């Protein structure tokens, strides 16, 4: 996918979450290119083009053309479902307490019912709710 990002952020490998645009973007002729990503999703820049455009909202007053793709996301799944290469439907756990795994169990960029593939298997996690969880890297 092609999009535009502030020139100071336009670096291959940069991972970011797209939160949407400003109301000032509505009248811009580049808004379809800038705002063509899905809100709340995590992306990684895979290529940086030389083309830049003026933009009063960004730090250096310019945006740069970049290629992006959905980024992989670290999360936790039930250990019995943690098989590299398998496809799962992501669901946030229903926890009764907040713990050190909260950011892993509730990652930004994934929504309930997202169809994902397990790319990597990490360590088993200690869950205060007694669930058997394993850290994984998902693509969607």
From Swiss-Prot:
InterPro entries: UPF0179 (IPR005369)
Family according to the record: Belongs to the UPF0179 family.
PANTHER family, per database record: UPF0179 PROTEIN MJ1627 (PTHR40699:SF1)
Gene source species: Methanosphaera stadtmanae (strain ATCC 43021 / DSM 3091 / JCM 11832 / MCB-3)
Protein's name in the database: UPF0179 protein Msp_0996
Domain of life: Archaea
């Amino acid at each position: 996918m092609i999009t535009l990002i502030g020139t100071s952020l336009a670096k291959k490998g940069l991972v970011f979450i797209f939160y949407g645009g400003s109301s000032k973007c509505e009248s811009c002729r580049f808004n379809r290119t800038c705002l063509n990503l899905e809100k709340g999703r995590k992306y990684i820049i895979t290529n940086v083009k030389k083309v830049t455009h003026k933009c009063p909202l960004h730090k250096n007053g310019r945006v740069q053309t970049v290629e992006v793709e959905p980024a992989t996301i670290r999360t936790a799944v039930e250990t019995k479902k943690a098989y590299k290469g398998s496809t799962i439907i992501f669901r946030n756990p229903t926890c009764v307490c907040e713990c050190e795994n909260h950011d892993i169990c509730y990652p930004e960029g994934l929504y309930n019912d997202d169809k994902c593939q397990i790319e990597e298997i990490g360590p088993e996690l200690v869950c205060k709710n007694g669930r058997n969880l394993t850290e994984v890297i998902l693509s969607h």
